[in-house]
From Swiss-Prot:
Belongs to the radical SAM superfamily. Lipoyl synthase family. Residues 46-262 form the Radical SAM core domain. Keywords: 4Fe-4S, Cytoplasm, Iron, Iron-sulfur, Metal-binding, S-adenosyl-L-methionine, Transferase. This is Lipoyl synthase. It is an enzyme of class 2 (transferase). InterPro entries: Aldolase_TIM, Elp3/MiaA/NifB-like_rSAM, Lipoyl_synth, rSAM. It comes from Anaplasma phagocytophilum (strain HZ). It comes from the Bacteria. [4Fe-4S] cluster 2 binds at residues 60, 64, 67. The gene is lipA. It is found in: Cytoplasm. It catalyses: [[Fe-S] cluster scaffold protein carrying a second [4Fe-4S](2+) cluster] + N(6)-octanoyl-L-lysyl-[protein] + 2 oxidized [2Fe-2S]-[ferredoxin] + 2 S-adenosyl-L-methionine + 4 H(+) = [[Fe-S] cluster scaffold protein] + N(6)-[(R)-dihydrolipoyl]-L-lysyl-[protein] + 4 Fe(3+) + 2 hydrogen sulfide + 2 5'-deoxyadenosine + 2 L-methionine + 2 reduced [2Fe-2S]-[ferredoxin]. The lineage of its organism: Bacteria, Pseudomonadati, Pseudomonadota, Alphaproteobacteria, Rickettsiales.
Amino acid sequence: MNSKPSWLRVKMPGGEVFEEVRDLVKRQRLNTVCEEAACPNIGECWNKRHATIMVMGDVCTRACAFCNVKTGVPRALDLGEPERVGEAISKLGLKHVVITSVDRDDLPDGGASHFAKCIREIRKRDPNVTIEILTPDFQGKPGAVDVIASARPDVYNHNLETVPRLYARVRPRAKYFNSLQLLQQVKDKTQGVFTKSGLMLGLGEQKEEVYQVMDDLRCAGVDFLVLGQYLQPTKDNIDVDRYVTPEEFEQYKRMAYAKGFSMVASSPLARSSYHAEDDFLRLRALRTARMRVAT
């Protein structure tokens, strides 16, 4: 498409705190989805000392059409990574952290146990840190959700990414209903854990299709919906079909709340981990208020 509209233009990242976070990530030999996915919000987030750690390497076993992460044969798991993640979170002084990963279809459990180890290393240093994880679908491997559930994350995020009709083009190695089933399993197996999912808009989806995905997510008990504009990371990725206007994002937000989501982030630059701490605090306060009313 032609140049981005004004509402998608952001400042070039930089600044003292930004450089401090980048140096710390490099010293700890960690990857971040902020860098690997070319996130437009990296400047704002890193200047607030917010970073989304991407574990299990920087090579993915899949090749989703929208993603900027490298595809290929990944290296063996770095067994020291969970400890380094814990140290980095402690040094950054974070109170809410987001951990994500590449797909690791080569591993027997898809990397679920590695997620669990990262959660435990963070909590070992500060039991009060709240932890949000954004996981792949683990190809539906038996026991993967149970392993992560045992580590008790505060928020479990798995993104559907797009509407079912576009899966063959956008997520050719994933299945829509497998992702829905994972989110349902998380709800069934974890008490008190918030579930979250997101869609990229501007890939050719129709409004009615987005509404149907909202209904499917609510049937799976998902609490939090994120809707953001798809931005083409490189010319090799799938093209942007159109730029969804801020007014349309507001319409989607109103509809999502009407369908029963507890929290909705819907704007052109909304991303899974953007303002994650603030959103989590609001979500937790909302649940507390509802429990008080119920009693």
